[in-house]
Amino acid sequence: MTSYDSGDNFASAAMMRILALGLKQEGIHFDVPSSSGAHVPIHEKRKVLDEVITRLGPVSLLRVSDAVRKLPPEPLAQALLKAKTIEDLHRRWTRMEAFTHGRHRLHFEAKERGKYVLHHQASSGSVLPSQAETLLVVGVLTNLMEIVSSAPVTVATLRGQVWRQNETWFPPAVPTDDRRVILEVGDVSAAPRQAFASAGEPTEITARIRSLLAADPLRRWYLSEVAEELCLSQRSLQRHLAKQATTFSRLIADTRLQCAAKLLCEEPGRGLAEVGFLSGYSDQAHFTRSFSQHVGLSPQSYRNNV
């Protein structure tokens, strides 16, 4: 394994951008590792996180995580925040981890309605995450959950110590050896659904489906959901697609392919793993295999030759 969080860890770079922005908003100067690209060396990341805890205390990492709300628009954050539910957000986060092949994983366990146990753990054969790494991850995920659910999230340890309540962070006990916390979502504000106008010609319907899929490639789309958006029955939608000599699964595959091709051509600095993740593929192998099969070139060869 290299000195990076395994290969193309765009997620680690995003964490450093959040940290840099949060410290800046607090008026605190820190030399945060450059994070404009996809790679952040592990030793640099851990060094700056440990320095933040030493100088400012553990609660500082929780507070700076609030900067995710003011992060300039970027594809990774937008892909996560398009989640429709907390469960959808967790699924997207897990898919992101599949692409980064990082040393750590987040295990989500749903309890009763609105309550989840989050365990920040090591991948097979890796060292445990540091206290600082766990605090930053918990802080960022809590903010994402509050944005997606439009509700406050209470964070507490299994022993009952409260870390966050009423949108305020409190100093965590030191050390946080267990690396498990309980996140409880308050009353969720259900956003009204906006459906497309009633269906028209098959070509128009197909264009609308492509528009829906392209707006959120990471979403686990179901035919029933798209039919509802278009004010159609599933059977009617299938008939419309058949008239266009296509299928729902074919449209999903085409949308992923077009999204990936666009990113490969227009954003040469974006890593291949991030391109695959943002385009909706399940993991790096799925991205490479599917892209090569349909285009005749690997993603890297396509980028080099087009």
Where do the protein language model's features map onto the residues?
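N-terminal low-complexity or simple alpha-helical regulatory segments
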Residues: 1-107
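Short, contiguous, pocket-lining structural segments
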Residues: 10-11, 40, 133, 201, ...
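DNA-contacting interfaces and partner/effector-binding or oligomerization modules
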Residues: 78-183
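Broad structural signal for hydrophobic residues in well-ordered alpha-helices, predominantly aliphatic
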Residues: 52, 65, 93-96, 145, ...
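Conserved short hydrophobic patches within well-ordered secondary structure
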Residues: 17-22, 139-143, 248
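Extended mid-to-C-terminal alpha-helical interaction segments
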Residues: 152, 159-306
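Residue-level recognition of alpha-helical structural elements
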Residues: 8-12, 129-130, 219
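A broad structural signal for alpha-helix termini and local helix breaks/kinks
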Residues: 26, 56, 145-149, 230, ...
